[in-house]
Amino acid sequence: MAAVPVPPPVPPKPLRPPRIGLALGGGAARGFAHIGVIQVLEEAGIKPDLVVGTSAGSLVAALYAAGRPGAELARVALAMDESAITDWSFPGRGLIRGEALARYVREQTGGKTIEQLPLPLGIVATDLDSGLPMLFQRGDVGLAVRASSAVPAVFQPVKIGSREYVDGGLVSPVPVRFARQMGAELVIAVDISAPPDGNATGDAFSMLLQTFAIMGKSINQFELKDADIVVRPLLAGVSSADFTARKRAIDAGRVAGLAALAGLRARIATLMH
């Protein structure tokens, strides 16, 4: 009787790492800290599969999604002329139009639309009429960043289609849920919000940002619970209105990113499948 051939053993299927989403939160000038976190991830060989940003985080997310490495992001940030992204308007629905910011983003992303960028990108803004969040994954990246960053009373609301939008930080200070919605299996959240600290606020812009911090605190606590890793750069002394402390913010992001690396690697190993 002929022997029945035994099929060769099937080699084990290699494990696949989880799909990683990077959620970059709002915090105005403190947003430069996101760059330091990105640099640490790159140096560790950890590459997010998608990035989503709110407010200041949307600007960094857009440039990162366009293929800018961390070192280049830092160079761009340190060279940024604040006046180049500020176009004052007559008092009305906002002191700043925001078109200069949109133009700057278009230039920095090579004029590509959101869906044409190398890395999947999501940008969160707030629908002014409904108060609901809107996740932009298609269209004009400059316009989406402008909408996401449109602090009410400072920036004019941004019309996209038939709707008007303002700062995404009002409804999603750190957009963890939207990273999940985009397909992330592991979410790294970077929280740069300035917690209300009881100190007296100075100018009107600082007072407005402090108000947002108070409003966003409970939303943040709820949303961050769904993140796998939360990175919180220590930004004491760096106010949301302080655009002169860019290098200090980037360095703070690096320190916080390095501190989170061990936990991140362990979480990635747990989610291999």
Residue ranges and their predicted role:
Residues M1-V52, L63-H273:
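Patatin-like phospholipase
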Residues G53, G57:
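Gly/Ala-rich beta-loop-alpha elbow adjacent to hydrolase catalytic centers
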